[in-house]
Each structure stands twice: as structure tokens, then as C-alpha cells.
Regions:
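Class I SAM-dependent methyltransferase Rossmann-like catalytic core
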Residues: 21-76
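Class I SAM-dependent methyltransferase SAM/SAH-binding core
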Residues: 65-131
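A short SAM/SAH-binding and catalytic strip from SAM-dependent methyltransferases
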Residues: 137-153
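A short glycine-rich, Lys/Arg-flanked "PGG" loop and its adjoining helix->strand segment in the class I
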Residues: 153-168
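Conserved class I S-adenosyl-L-methionine
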Residues: 168-191
Length: 191
């Protein structure tokens, strides 16, 4: 199997730029065990992700399906945050966008992505707050990387802050992963 993909979630943005993201505490997911977001390799993510990996993590069929979905949900001419991006965004080439802001862990990969109009490197496991203004994004995407987040509730809450009212946040996932960097709860799933 070469990267089955699925859609994890989709939710609308905040109720307005003045709406603050909800306060998140470690008990925000009390139904999960305390070690749910631990990893086999808790070493520095910037070192692990330093070598550029110019590969796709889902197969051609999954890429086509994801691109078609993006075409149906991302507003033409909008500003998009491509969270945890790489050298390819899977956004349809024929979808005109005002801006695609890339976030990732590898500067070489992000610089190679032709869809990104600007990008930044940040370890969300160290700092889940994104350096972007409230309500400035018409969509946010997180493609096949959610399994690496140790603070997903905090990151998702901050993405909510960035979204315009009603803007979608599309989280896609695959059965392919770097297992030592994936969180325990993800490794326990039968994907």
C-alpha cells in the first residue's frame, strides 16, 4: 500500500477576527492517556527533519482526490495556510490564490514549493502559536502530517484564530508515517 489517504476533519473558522482561540489546558483531552502524545524519538525535530525529503507521502490517486477536494472547498483568490508543508502542496494548479503561506520544518523543501508565496520554519511541538495575524486566512490545510503534533489541540486552536469566519481547515492523513516521530495515540491506530 502506497499511502492511502483520508480526511480527518473539517471545521469552520472563528466567529470573527476579535474572537479569541479557546484556552487549552493539558486536560483538554482527558479521555486520552497521559502518554498519548509521547514519541519513540523525542529528540530535536529540527535535526530529524533537516535532510530534505523531496518525495510524496501519498500515491497519485490520493493526490488527485485531495487536489479535487481542495478545488471544491478552497475559495478562489483567497489566502491559504499550508500547515506542515513541504516541497509540494497538492493545491490544484488551476486554482488561483492571492497567497499561499507555507509552514514546515525544512527550509529547502519549502523553498522548492512553487505554490508558496511565502513560508516560514517553526517547530510547532516547541511553540504551537503561529506568527500570523488573526482572521487573515481563507483556508488552512494540513496534509499528511498531523501525526507528528504533540500539541494538536493548541495548534488547531491557533489555526482557528487565523481563519476568517466560516473558513475551512482541512486535515488529511495517510497510513504512511515516520513511526519514531509519530505520537503514541497515532501509532496505536490501525491505518
Amino acid at each position: 500500500d502506497h499511502g492511502r489517504a483520508g480526511l480527518l476533519g473539517l471545521f469552520g473558522g472563528n466567529s470573527g477576527p476579535a474572537h479569541a482561540a479557546p484556552k487549552v489546558t493539558p486536560t483538554a483531552l482527558p479521555e486520552l492517556p497521559a502518554n498519548a502524545f509521547s514519541r519513540i524519538d523525542d529528540g530535536d525535530d529540527s535535526l530529524f527533519f533537516a535532510p530534505p525529503r523531496l518525495v510524496t507521502h501519498i500515491d497519485a490517486g490520493a493526490i488527485a482526490a485531495l487536489s479535487d477536494f481542495y478545488r471544491s472547498i478552497v475559495r478562489k483568490g483567497g489566502a491559504v495556510l499550508d500547515l506542515m508543508s513541504s516541497w509540494v502542496s497538492h493545491l490544484p494548479e488551476d486554482l488561483p490564490l492571492a497567497e499561499v503561506i507555507g509552514h514546515g520544518m525544512n527550509a529547502q523543501e519549502l523553498a522548492a514549493n512553487p505554490r508558496l508565496t511565502r513560508w516560514f520554519v517553526q517547530d510547532l511541538n516547541r511553540d504551537p502559536r503561529l506568527p500570523l495575524p488573526d482572521g487573515g486566512c481563507d483556508a488552512a490545510l494540513c496534509c499528511v502530517s498531523v501525526q507528528y503534533l504533540q500539541k494538536p489541540v493548541e495548534v488547531f486552536g491557533d489555526v482557528r484564530r487565523l481563519l476568517c469566519p466560516g473558513a475551512p481547515f482541512v486535515v488529511s492523513f495517510s497510513n504512511r508515517t515516520f513511526p519514531t516521530k509519530s505520537v503514541a495515540v497515532w501509532r496505536s491506530l490501525d491505518l
